[in-house]
Curated annotation (Swiss-Prot):
SUPFAM superfamilies: UDP-Glycosyltransferase/glycogen phosphorylase. GO terms for molecular function: UDP-N-acetyl-D-glucosamine:N-acetylmuramoyl-L-alanyl-D-glutamyl-meso-2,6-diaminopimelyl-D-alanyl-D-alanine-diphosphoundecaprenol 4-beta-N-acetylglucosaminlytransferase activity; undecaprenyldiphospho-muramoylpentapeptide beta-N-acetylglucosaminyltransferase activity. It comes from Wigglesworthia glossinidia brevipalpis. InterPro entries: GlcNAc_MurG (IPR006009), Glyco_trans_28_C (IPR007235), GlycoTrans_28_N (IPR004276). Its main location: membrane. It is a peripheral membrane protein. Belongs to the glycosyltransferase 28 family. MurG subfamily. It is an enzyme of class 2 (transferase). The keyword Lipid biosynthesis does not apply. This is UDP-N-acetylglucosamine--N-acetylmuramyl-(pentapeptide) pyrophosphoryl-undecaprenol N-acetylglucosamine transferase.
Amino acid sequence: MKNTKIKIIITGGGSGGHVFVGLSIAEQLIKIGCEILWIGSSDRIESYLIPKSNIKIYKINVIGFNGNNIFLKLISLIKTAYSILKIKKLIKYYKPDIVLSIGGYVSFPGAIATWISKVPLIIHEQNSVPGLSNYILYKLTNCKILQAFPNTFPRAKVVGNPIRNAILKIKTPEKRFLGRFGPLRILVIGGSQGASILNLVIPDVAKYLPNKFHIWHQSGYSEYELVKSKYEKLFHHTEYKVFDFIKDISIAYEWADLIICRSGALTVSEISSIGIAALFVPYNHKDNHQYWNAKILEKIGAAEIINQKDFTKKKLIKLLSSWDRKKSLIMSQKSKNLSITNSAKKIIKEINNLIGLVK
């Protein structure tokens, strides 16, 4: 990149998936001397995670447009319009060289303000089905579109989802599984907010399959005490750990033989980059994007899917009773073979190409 300090705005957030992708890119950009300003929500995960990473954040107050409540939709439109005006003024003052939109409804005002201001805009779509914000931006603007998975947008470049460095350092499946014996190690992850269906069903399943598993279970903050008490009532020889939130997920990933989790875009990308057998329980979003994220690994035999309505104690006991480490290793190897490496570098290359074209 050029010797002068390049200013880049990253806009988006709302969920851990969006934020961790953006942070992975931001860290690489800072290393090569770029100045980063983040535009995010005032009351979501980015509002406290971004400052912890020593990145300046400009907070806006927006709400999503989904749902059937007409009044809330109207409020969403008003807040979005107001935020567009605020960000337009910010862009005029800050003078960014380029803006990167990482998705989520909070990204929309920043991306629209960028387009109106005629500043170069790149959109990164993390899911296999585009979110509403990115779909509108794709139709409305002439911005550069990058995608994590093939066929989300026609003719868009596939770059994957950037993965945190600690996760990229995890050993290959062959090295992890070498000499591993004893009960199957199951990691249960419900996302940063937890997942009630996993918290409800899995402790009961463990009770019916004693001695077969060791379980690490991330419950989320709100149901931590409930899940912990469920496991405490199990047989004393059942090994388990319950976490409200696993701070260093790379340790948990390296430990696991099998992961049972939702199928958000970043989770699927992390699982593939490491190579872990997965049992996905997609969240029932309106556009069903988590199901289609999971389908990418399920199609190659690297994962299995149970829809939430079918995720019962009986079905899970039947599935897990015959699951062994050999099956996990084969699935892990298939998953690893699909991984996309150097995603952050690919995105930075596209940023550099676009700035070079317009300067």
